[in-house]
Amino acid sequence: MKNLVILSGAGISAESGIKTFRDAGGLWEGHDIMEVASPYGWKKNPQKVLDFYNQRRRQLFEVYPNKAHKALAELEKHYQVNIITQNVDDLHERAGSSRILHLHGELLSVRSEKDPNLVYRWEKDLNLGDLAQDKAQLRPDIVWFGEEVPLLKEAVSLVKQVHLLIIIGTSLQVYPAASLYTHANKDALIYYIDPKAKNARLPQNVQCINENAVHAMQDLMPKLIEMASQEMLK
């Protein structure tokens, strides 16, 4: 099977009802990003940070994978698929995808504020006084602004091996994830799916699809399956 990597962002989850912080009506409206998603904000007002992520975690149980998530999972029948996602939700997992790299962490995980290796699955609200095994306060297992991205090297390695790369639902404005596609082999086929894709300044080898995730994947699926069956990728 050919290697296919999906780089997904907030746009694909927005179609399931998860609000995005870059949209005018998004969940982050009214919040200074650095107040709720940075080590500075955590030190200044941990309760505010916990309240913010508790709200986001609760929202997960009100939304479901959409047809784009399910289409990406379906591609595992035809390709060796790895998903690199900037999203912290679990919609790819619930859609049936099996190999997912969460670059920016996961809402359903928490960790010790002292030891990032002490990670726990967490579905309820997180409160001050909830402690890890090392007696440190638990914090959201999220990569905050100003923190290193621990899985970046693994993500780069996956992109370097691809025959096909699909970038979907991301504005390509959040670094370092936005530059991942530049590590693809020059012979790799790259699709960029986003309602504003044609406005992006991308290399000529990137094929832009100016649609939302659901419609684009419905249109693209037959071609992707045909390419896999006919070994059309180098």
UniProtKB/Swiss-Prot annotation:
Pfam families with a match to the protein in the record: SIR2 (PF02146)
Superkingdom field: Bacteria
PROSITE patterns: SIRTUIN
Residues covered by the Deacetylase sirtuin-type domain: 1-234
Residues binding substrate: 53, 56
Top-level EC class as recorded in UniProt: transferase
GO MF, any single term: histone deacetylase activity, NAD-dependent
Catalysed reaction equations from the record: N(6)-acetyl-L-lysyl-[protein] + NAD(+) + H2O = 2''-O-acetyl-ADP-D-ribose + nicotinamide + L-lysyl-[protein]; N(6)-succinyl-L-lysyl-[protein] + NAD(+) + H2O = 2''-O-succinyl-ADP-D-ribose + nicotinamide + L-lysyl-[protein]
Function (record text): NAD-dependent lysine deacetylase and desuccinylase that specifically removes acetyl and succinyl groups on target proteins. Modulates the activities of several proteins which are inactive in their acylated form.
The name this protein goes by in its record: NAD-dependent protein deacylase
Gene responsible for this protein: cobB
